[in-house]
Amino acid sequence: MFGKMEMDWQIEEFMLYCRTRQLRKKTMGSYEQTLRLFERWCREKLDIATVDRISENVIRRYIADLQERGKYSFYAEEQTKQKNHPDRRRDFRKPISVTTINNYLRNIRVLFNWLESEEVIRKNPMKKVRLLKHNRQAKEYLSDEEMRKLISRMDKSYFPEHRDYVMIVLMFDTGMRLGECSSLVMRDVDLSSRRIMLRAEITKGRKDRIVYFSAKTETILRRWLQFKDRYVDTDYLFPVKRSGNPVSVCNFECNFKKYLARSSLNPNVSPHCLRNNFAKRCLMNGIAWCFYLIRAFVSIYKSSSCSFCKLSQTPRG
């Protein structure tokens, strides 16, 4: 059963396997980017081109190299460097975070677990490799005052900022993820009952989920729909004005950083912080609502770990 060993070929086979499993494009993109980077590093740094020559020691050398070289100092393809000019980035060669390195290791582990299950390799080099340890930090969140400051500085006469304003309010009010919010279409939203159906194909857990929003958010959504329909004819709830396609996560994240800077707020706050805020408000809503909140929290937030609850209750200094 031990067949073709070239790493490049095996990555192609693995990606084909991922497509047959109907994994999300984002997941497959993460796998391929990580694996192509690792494949080129093995080939250029160690002259290794086959998966059977990858050992535990090779993996550990790769980890050490990641820790030493810094961000964007190695790339999967020459075209990537020529197109993106990583050396012009402000964070060029800054340390790669432990979280990022661990994500790389998880993706590499998935490949070698698959190779082992397919009997392409006899020994799995990732079997004894552990994720790097790092100190978990309390989740970032915005206070009510900071939230008001953030949205008050947004220009709602300008299409992109009006769209982003409504997205921020909606995520803050419902606890939905950015990727879920950006993928919404008109039929997902029921304004009369003030609820949104998050379809299985856009949720992280691949299960339908319903979230509810307030009367104030309903008013904001109705105004947005009137505004949007004057400029774009699309079924997407939060489109890009020119194309009518849904705003990308990357686009929104870049805009969000700009809004934080404009409001002189913590630059480390991310859009996911709005989801943290939602969970924190649920947890702090009073002991009398305990059973209701637990059911709502599990249903809406779908958190897989109670560790979030502990971290989100940590007061800010």
Model feature map: region roles:
Residues 12-29, 35-138, 153-157:
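N-terminal core-binding DNA-recognition domain of tyrosine recombinases/integrases
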Residues 28, 108, 167-168, 175, ...:
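Alpha-helix N-cap/helix-start motif at helix boundaries, enriched for small hydrophobics
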Residues 119, 170-183, 285-287, 296-299:
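A short, glycine-centered helix-capping/turn motif at helix boundaries
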Residues 121, 134-149, 204-216, 231-235, ...:
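DNA breakage-rejoining catalytic core of tyrosine-based enzymes
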Residues 121, 135-136, 149-178, 232:
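Basic, Lys/Arg- and aromatic-enriched nucleic-acid-binding interface segment
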Residues 155-159, 233, 253-294, 301, ...:
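Short, basic (Lys/Arg/His-rich) helix/loop patches that form interaction surfaces
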Residues 178-179, 183-223:
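Conserved tyrosine-mediated DNA breakage-rejoining catalytic core shared by Y-recombinases
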Residues 214-266:
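Active-site/catalytic core of tyrosine-dependent DNA strand-transfer enzymes
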